[in-house]
């Protein structure tokens, strides 16, 4: 799960660079939406990964 969280975080950073940096003016609105979408997905997968990391089940 933490791998997916890291992937979504990287995608969010890339979307932010395009949306907030003015590189792609025509796609700025879409990039901003994608940034927040992937940022939310990053947080969700991060929480799922941290909660799912429990010790081995009792025998």
From Swiss-Prot:
Keyword Zinc-finger among UniProt keywords: no
Transmembrane segments: 5-25, 30-50
Gene Ontology CC terms: plasma membrane
Signal peptide range: none
Keyword Membrane: yes
Coiled-coil segments on the chain, per record: none
Membrane topology classification: Multi-pass membrane protein
Domain of life: Bacteria
Pfam families: DUF1328
Compartments, record wording: Cell membrane
Keywords per UniProt: Cell membrane, Membrane, Transmembrane, Transmembrane helix
Membership in a protein family: Belongs to the UPF0391 family.
Protein name (database record): UPF0391 membrane protein lpp2589
Organism of this sequence: Legionella pneumophila (strain Paris)
């Amino acid at each position: 799960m933490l791998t997916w969280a890291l992937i979504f975080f990287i995608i969010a950073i890339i979307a932010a660079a395009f949306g907030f940096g003015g590189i792609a003016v025509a796609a700025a609105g879409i990039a901003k939406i994608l940034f927040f979408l992937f940022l939310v997905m990053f947080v969700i997968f991060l929480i799922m990964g941290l909660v799912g990391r429990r010790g081995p089940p009792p025998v």
